[in-house]
Amino acid sequence: MKNKFILPLVVLGSSVFGQFTVSGQLENYANKSVLVKIYENSDLKLIKNTKTDAQGNFSANVPKEYNGFVRIDLPTGENLSLLTDNKNLKFKTVAGQDIMNRLEIIEGNTQKEYNKIIAMQPLNEVQNQVFPYLMQMYKPTDEFYQAMIKEQNRINVLNKDAKYSGLVEYIKTLNDLKQAAQSGKDTQAVDKIVTHFVNDDDRLEQSGLFNDLVFAYVNTKLSTGQGDNVEEKLIAATDEILAKTDITTPRGQNILSTLLNIVPKDQYAGFHKKYVDKVNGLTCKITDQLKKRVGQATSMQIGSQVPNITFDKPINGKKSLYDIKANQKLIVFWASWCPACQQEIPYIKEFYKDFKAKGGEIVAISLDFDETAFKDATKDLPWYNYTDLLRWDSPIAEQFSVSSTPTLFLVDKDNKIIKEVHHISELEAAKK
């Protein structure tokens, strides 16, 4: 990766050294949890788990230089992505379905500018997706056809006249490129994506579009490459992009980390083995993100020992997963907000009766966010129940490579994995 900027540098000042603040007010959202995240090495990273005050106010400090999207996550599933050029962000909105519609930016010129692009998106979608379809149904001489041409010209003028600052223009360029690659209209889209991967600074990782561009790149390569073997085409596309970005650089490692995440391991085991082995053979510095990807690929296998889970407070006198002694343990990852989990709970309860009688124990790890919801959901569950109230940001879920709920790990008395399943019926069937 070439270490150069394609955008003008921010004028030097105190903000260059980070330490800017994200603050907001959420109406109808008093004394509730808020997760503040930024993109680091293309992945979302939690920087603060905080609570609103009685008026719905909260604030969080971003402790480093950052030019990209800050994401605000609420336990109900809503989120906001706000663009910053390393300067303070302040906003006001209402929690719930209108979180975007009622958004008011009080401080943050970059997001105010980006709102103009958001406002143009419906018009551009009509122009690019609706009009081409409708025009096939009319003659060029028809009045409605002429009206569509007139509207297309108006939209083109609006887009042409719009002027944006460096960071906003950059984000727009990346988003347009992603859409062009997905639509297949731009035959040079892949080459343009590669150019960004090779030349851009870390604003590419902070754009929130990095993973989308990696996916667009590999998907296009799969659809245009020679041969029918998907795994071979995946490997060829990966080798090609790593040769251009260099696997010893953070950029090359970020690309590989993304690919290891999006390519299903159960379908393409050869792909994963090749690149896990390649990473294990590197002598250069490896990003924490790639270390985790490779570590997860090798640690959660049948026969391997699961990580210990230390509880914030003792549960029934036990301080950790390892403290719970049993012939076998069933570690259940679930959540009160997960419909599939709620359907599974009655079957787990029934399974527990015989399992407990034979010296087994269940430890349920809930990926919840709201403490009240967790307590209500677990008050009648007879096993060990724990949550760190971080939902998918839970380091426990990351350590266990859990990407969906419910996920169940059956382990022996030494905490070594016997089986991983997603439904209790799979364990019942294995007994027959």
State where each predicted segment sits.
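Charged, long alpha-helical assembly modules
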Residues: 174-251
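Bacterial Sec-dependent N-terminal signal peptides
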Residues: 1-25, 432
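Short active-site neighborhood of thiol/selenol oxidoreductases, capturing the structured segment around
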Residues: 319-348, 361-363
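Thiol/disulfide oxidoreductase modules built on the thioredoxin-like
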Residues: 392-432
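Helix-turn-helix repeat elements of alpha-solenoid scaffolds
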Residues: 146-151, 228-236, 267-271
